[in-house]
Amino acid sequence: MKDKRKGAGGRKSPVLYIVMLSVWSLLCAAIWYYFVPAFITPPFAAGTGGNLALRIFAVVLLVLNALFISYFWLNGVKDFLYVMWYTFSRRKLEAKYRKVLETDVRSVSDKVLMLYCTCNDFDGESLRRSMRQTYAHAETVILDDSSQPEYKEKVDAFARETGVRVVRRADRKGFKAGNINHFLQSEEVRRSDYGYVVILDSDEIIPPDFIVSCLRYFYAYENVGIVQANHVATRNRNFFMKLFHIGVNSHWPTYQTMKHNYGFSSMLGHGAMIRRECYEQAGGFPDLVAEDLCLSIEMR
């Protein structure tokens, strides 16, 4: 298949953030207009009995209060405008994905590694369902960092049943990031011809067309390094989870769409597909707790 891919996104518009900062600045001006006179002449000055230290302490608290309110207003304005902007521009934004949907990847044969990361939390049924991909050139590998024998036995039993490869290491250096790097940066894998990597968490279930859908993005746009799917909460066992998942499920398409079109999108740690050359040029996952965000920054 001839590669005719072009760059995605182009230069992103700053309009949303100009509006956001303008609204926030007006709110800050209002609150500081109210607080500044209190800094100069505190309304409680008469009750301090001329104690200068007490007055200074009170003014410091007022300043901190104003700063905290200003900061939380910034987050509130951001979330409010994200929702409103998405609501009124949704059709226009979704039209940009038409090119992706029309991209034909039926003749693509790139090798895709599906890396299932687990550490004392193996869920065989979730992995089994995730492995039912319509894409024929995918290989699943279990990266097992488990220390408890019962979970190791579950992994080994699953591997015997399905023929899936299991990779373990001597220590847990770097935790999840180190686990992935240990495998992908091994001499054997570096000599192989894989083109993409899918990162799976232990209880995650991806749909059968996940790889095919992600490949459309990579073949539609040559500068896509990570395709991050939205997460949907499906295992809601009590009232709180059933109520909370409504907000979570609506958050991802709204928040991620706005960040993608007007800001900086980041990997969410799993449910994502990564282009090999981008992973290698970034030097792998940084050995930090927020390895997904750090890798996104490195790739950026």
Give the location of each predicted region:
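Cell-envelope/extracellular polymer assembly enzymes that use nucleotide-activated donors
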Residues: 110-113, 139, 294
